[in-house]
Each structure stands twice: as structure tokens, then as C-alpha cells.
Design a protein with these regions (language model features):
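Intrinsically disordered, low-complexity regulatory regions
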Residues: 1-98
């Protein structure tokens, strides 16, 4: 589920735009429905995970808000991450007008 979150957030610029962010949100709600949540492996430190997420975000031009969604949904406050994603979807044209 979280893999699809990352995939759709990363590719939305190049593929289906707002529809991809809506798919990411859909997968998060599925995770909630089925109580299916990703847990970081115990042998991976939080700092290592953050370093790798930063590297991934830089390599894929992830915006600060998109980064926040991924970070919060994976190792932070999932509900907050979902609210940020919902805001990105609801304000897609305004936020991504470039």
C-alpha cells in the first residue's frame, strides 16, 4: 500500500497528474480500511530511513509537501500525511500551476 503511495506521488508529474495523487490517497484509505500499515524493519534506523528518503526525494524532484506526505504516512503521523495529500489534491491546479 505504501509502495503505491510513493509510486503515485513520484510519477504524477509525468503521467496522470491529479488522478495519480487521488490513487495514492485511495491506497492509504484502503490501508486504513484493512488495518494494513507499513512498519519500518527493526534493523533500519530512523536516521538511515530519513537519509534514504531525502536521497530519493532529491533524485525525483519531490516537493516539500509531497515529501511531508510520504514521511508522515510511513514513519510519522499518518492522519496528518493524509490531510496534506487531500489538500494537495483539492488544490492541485493552484499548487502545480507552473
Amino acid at each position: 500500500i505504501e509502495g503505491n503511495l510513493v509510486k503515485y506521488i513520484t510519477r504524477h508529474y509525468k503521467k496522470n497528474g491529479k488522478e495519480d495523487l487521488e490513487k495514492a490517497y485511495h491506497y492509504l484509505t484502503l490501508g486504513d480500511t484493512f488495518n494494513c500499515y507499513w512498519l519500518a524493519p527493526k534493523n533500519i534506523s530512523r536516521s538511515f530511513f530519513i537519509e534514504e528518503l531525502n536521497r530519493y526525494a532529491n533524485a525525483n524532484n519531490i516537493t516539500e509537501l509531497e515529501y511531508s506526505v510520504i514521511y508522515e504516512c510511513l514513519i510519522g503521523d499518518r492522519n496528518y500525511g493524509m490531510r496534506v495529500l487531500r489538500t494537495l489534491i483539492d488544490n492541485y491546479d493552484e499548487y502545480y500551476k507552473k
